[in-house]
C-alpha cells in the first residue's frame, strides 16, 4: 500500500430516514460506486436519484475530478440517495473549508429530520382512526 494513496481519501457520513451512507472521495475520473456496483445500476437509472448523488460535486464543479465510493445500508433508494448526497457534501467540506459555504447555501449539509411517524394505539395507522359509526 502506498502512503500517498491513503493520504488523499476524504470521508463523510450522511443520514436520511433510516439510511446511513459512508462516502469516500478519491481523486479520479468521476465514477460513482455504491456497495461495489456502478451508481447508475444501483439507483435503477433514476435521474432524480443520480442528480441528488451528484449535486454536491456539481455545486463546486468537481464532478469529473473525484471518484465517489459509497457503503450504504438501511431504508429505500430515496433515503439512500439523500444520505449519499449529505455524506459527499461532508467529505467535500473535509477537502477544503472554503467548500462549506456554497454547500450550505444549496442545502446539501442539512440533515432532513423527517422520519416515519409511529403508530399510536387505538388507531389503524399513525393518524388514521377506525371508521366511526353513529349507531
Swiss-Prot record:
One Pfam family matching this protein: Ribosomal_S9
PROSITE patterns recorded: RIBOSOMAL_S9 (PS00360)
Gene Ontology terms for molecular function: RNA binding; structural constituent of ribosome
GO cellular component, one term: cytosolic small ribosomal subunit
Disordered, as annotated region: 96-135
GO BP of this protein: translation
Cross-referenced Gene3D superfamilies: 3.30.230.10
Keyword Mitochondrion: no
Protein family: Belongs to the universal ribosomal protein uS9 family.
Biased composition (Basic and acidic residues): 97-115
InterPro entries in the cross-refs: Ribosomal_Su5_D2-typ_SF (IPR020568), Ribosomal_uS9 (IPR000754), Ribosomal_uS9_bac/plastid (IPR023035), Ribosomal_uS9_CS (IPR020574), Ribsml_uS5_D2-typ_fold_subgr (IPR014721)
Name used for this protein in its record: Small ribosomal subunit protein uS9
Record key words, sorted: Ribonucleoprotein, Ribosomal protein
UniProt feature, compositional bias: Basic residues: 116-135
Amino acid at each position: 500500500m502506498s502512503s500517498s494513496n491513503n493520504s488523499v481519501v476524504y470521508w463523510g457520513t450522511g443520514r436520511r430516514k433510516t439510511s446511513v451512507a459512508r462516502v469516500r472521495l478519491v481523486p479520479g475520473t468521476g465514477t460513482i460506486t455504491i456497495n461495489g456496483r456502478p451508481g447508475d445500476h444501483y439507483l435503477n437509472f433514476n435521474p432524480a436519484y443520480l442528480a441528488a448523488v451528484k449535486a454536491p460535486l456539481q455545486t463546486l464543479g468537481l464532478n469529473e475530478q473525484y471518484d465517489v465510493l459509497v457503503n450504504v445500508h438501511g431504508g429505500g433508494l430515496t433515503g439512500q440517495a439523500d444520505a449519499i448526497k449529505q455524506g459527499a457534501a461532508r467529505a467535500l467540506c473535509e477537502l477544503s473549508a472554503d467548500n462549506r459555504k456554497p454547500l450550505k447555501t444549496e442545502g446539501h449539509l442539512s440533515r432532513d429530520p423527517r422520519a416515519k411517524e409511529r403508530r399510536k394505539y387505538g388507531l389503524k395507522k399513525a393518524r388514521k382512526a377506525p371508521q366511526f359509526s353513529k349507531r
